[in-house]
């Protein structure tokens, strides 16, 4: 019985253990199936995880880029905010004023001129008071303290310096007396830029009227507006047909300058001035320029100098006149003051008044004004003042010397009077030789007629064209003049010839040669070109000026003597003009001959 119970219990235990083992086997089988299934699904999951990882990395890169862009935008926005804040702060600041520095004081304060007031203000610690200069522009804050310094004023009013006022010790000071365009005088301070500058009376200065400071010397002085100051390069050899006149002017000008000791020994006073008179275009201005050049060369040779210097002050006569009373006289004084300064340097100075009759007319001859009543005496006093000066001579030129005030022409002022005549045939040849040179392109046909000798060809061309100009033939008849006594006279084109007309004829001939070369490819100037140019020049001058006073016109043209009361032209076939027209009825006007 006991064994049976024990067997039953063992059987039950074994059965239970078998059941447990069966359960475990079933569980393990399920686990094994699950493991097998997982092993089967594992590669697919790996691929999915890899895909998710790649997507996450791409999203991370995008987020990183966006983050960097946002950071950059944030930095830019922060910088813009700072800039805008600075701009707002700057716009919110009170306005700063400008002033002019006047003087410094021992206590560190300075005087400035601003807003029409003179103030004593402090200077910012960032600036050195010792570095501030009189007349300098400074910046003032809202408390009117200097916070910055700049340069000098660059714009203002132009005035004429009359004189630099002396300081307490008698030396040139820091103030000047100036004259405005309205002839108003005022005293101004000189900025430090002008304290040591070489300024003189007559210079133009730029001032700032409110602060009364002069800042800058304008390079062109007032007197330079009236004269042409130059070193002439014209020589006597450049002038043709005036040998006698050149000899006269050499005796009058060069001898006193080059042999001053002989003049003093003989107690001979050198001439103060020369008057060159004659018809227009005959070389008066050219001679005056040659005088200055020749005189400078001679003086340089005597001194043993290689470089020669001379000054030719060519006065623009009509520009001397000014509507304000006394201005014309002041201009004349400035001209002679400049001449004295240049002469003081030891160089010859020629003061040349061209068209002298336009300014220095006979006193009392004015129709509507009496301006010459004060201008002429001013010139007379200046010419008399030249007596004690060295290297200065006055030369006047005019084609109406009868209209110049007699006090100017009397001995002791314009001592030497030289008439510049119209060129005769020989003088015309000499003038032509200055413009027609063997080196010019000459036509082969003309050269062939003279054995290809350029010199002979040029000489023959000049002889032929002068013969054409000066022959008293029917085609050269120009005018018939009637004098007050009833006499009549026939004038030819040669009677109105001049050096300027000869130059114009040569220029016309050269132009014709150029035009022929461009059309026919045959190069060189021919005699026919000059003859045609001569005809064209005469034809252009056949219409006289439309004046009702033929006697005045004749005087300007150089025909003086018996008074002319009537003029009629004798030219036919030119420009459609009818022969026999009187000057009073001429419809077309031309130039003075």
Swiss-Prot record:
GO terms for molecular function: ATP binding; ATP hydrolysis activity. Pfam families: AAA, Prot_ATP_ID_OB_C, Prot_ATP_ID_OB_N. Residues 574-593 are annotated as: Disordered. This is Proteasome-associated ATPase. Residues 584-593 have a biased composition (Polar residues). Keywords: ATP-binding, Chaperone, Coiled coil, Nucleotide-binding, Proteasome. Residues 592-593 are annotated as: Docks into pockets in the proteasome alpha-ring. Homohexamer. Assembles into a hexameric ring structure that caps the 20S proteasome core. Strongly interacts with the prokaryotic ubiquitin-like protein Pup through a hydrophobic interface; the interacting region of ARC lies in its N-terminal coiled-coil domain. There is one Pup binding site per ARC hexamer ring. Upon ATP-binding, the C-terminus of ARC interacts with the alpha-rings of the proteasome core, possibly by binding to the intersubunit pockets. GO terms for cellular component: proteasome complex. Pathway: Protein degradation; proteasomal Pup-dependent pathway.
């Amino acid at each position: 019985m006991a064994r049976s119970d024990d067997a039953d219990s063992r059987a039950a235990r074994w059965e239970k253990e078998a059941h447990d083992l069966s359960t475990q086997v079933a569980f393990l089988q399920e686990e094994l199936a699950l493991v097998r299934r997982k092993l089967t699904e594992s590669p697919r999951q790996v691929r999915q995880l890899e895909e998710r990882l790649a997507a996450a990395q791409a999203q991370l890169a995008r987020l990183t880029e966006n983050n960097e862009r946002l950071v950059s935008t944030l930095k830019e926005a922060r910088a813009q905010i700072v800039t805008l804040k600075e701009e707002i702060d700057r716009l919110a600041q009170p306005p700063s004023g400008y002033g002019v520095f006047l003087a410094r004081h021992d206590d560190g304060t300075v005087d400035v001129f601003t807003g029409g007031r003179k103030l004593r203000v402090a200077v910012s610690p960032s600036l050195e008071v010792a570095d501030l200069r009189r007349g300098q522009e400074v910046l003032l804050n809202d408390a009117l303290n200097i916070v910055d310094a700049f340069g000098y004023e660059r714009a203002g009013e132009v005035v004429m310096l009359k004189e630099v006022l002396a300081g307490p010790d008698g030396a040139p000071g820091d103030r000047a007396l100036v004259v405005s365009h309205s002839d108003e005088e005022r005293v101004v301070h000189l900025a430090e830029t002008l304290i040591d500058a070489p300024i003189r009376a007559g210079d133009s200065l730029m001032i700032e009227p409110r602060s009364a400071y002069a800042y800058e010397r304008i390079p062109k002085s007032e007197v330079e507006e009236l004269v042409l100051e130059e070193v002439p390069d014209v020589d006597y050899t450049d002038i043709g047909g005036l040998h006698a006149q050149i000899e006269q002017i050499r005796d009058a000008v060069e001898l006193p300058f080059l042999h001053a000791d002989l003049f003093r020994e003989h107690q001979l006073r050198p001439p103060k001035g020369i008057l060159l008179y004659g018809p227009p275009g005959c070389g008066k201005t050219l001679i005056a320029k040659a005088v200055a050049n020749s005189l400078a060369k001679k003086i340089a040779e005597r001194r043993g100098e290689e470089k020669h210097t001379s000054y030719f002050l060519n006065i623009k006569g009509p520009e001397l006149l000014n509507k304000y009373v006394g201005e014309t006289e002041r201009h004349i004084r400035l001209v002679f003051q400049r001449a004295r300064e240049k002469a003081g340097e030891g160089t010859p100075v020629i003061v040349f008044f061209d068209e002298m009759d336009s300014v220095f007319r006979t006193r009392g001859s004015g129709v509507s004004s009496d301006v010459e009543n004060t201008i002429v005496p001013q010139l007379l006093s200046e010419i008399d003042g030249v007596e004690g000066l060295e290297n200065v001579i006055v030369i006047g030129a005019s084609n109406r010397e009868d209209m110049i005030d007699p006090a100017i022409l009397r001995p002791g002022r314009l001592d030497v009077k030289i008439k510049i005549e119209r060129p005769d045939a020989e003088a015309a040849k000499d003038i032509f030789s200055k413009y027609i040179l063997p080196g010019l392109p000459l036509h082969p046909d003309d050269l062939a007629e003279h054995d290809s000798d350029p010199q002979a060809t040029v000489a023959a061309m000049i002889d032929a064209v002068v013969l054409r100009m000066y022959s008293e033939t029917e085609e050269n008849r120009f005018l018939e003049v009637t004098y007050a006594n009833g006499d009549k006279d026939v004038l030819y084109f040669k009677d109105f010839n001049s050096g300027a007309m000869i130059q114009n004829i040569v220029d016309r001939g050269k132009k014709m040669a150029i035009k022929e070369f461009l059309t026919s490819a045959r190069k060189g100037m021919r005699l026919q070109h000059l003859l045609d140019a001569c005809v064209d020049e005469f034809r252009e001058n056949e219409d006289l000026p439309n004046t009702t006073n033929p006697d005045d016109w004749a005087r300007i043209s150089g025909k003086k003597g018996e008074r002319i009361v009537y003029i009629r032209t004798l030219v036919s076939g030119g420009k459609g003009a009818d022969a026999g027209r009187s000057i009073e009825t001429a419809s077309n006007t031309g130039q003075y001959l």
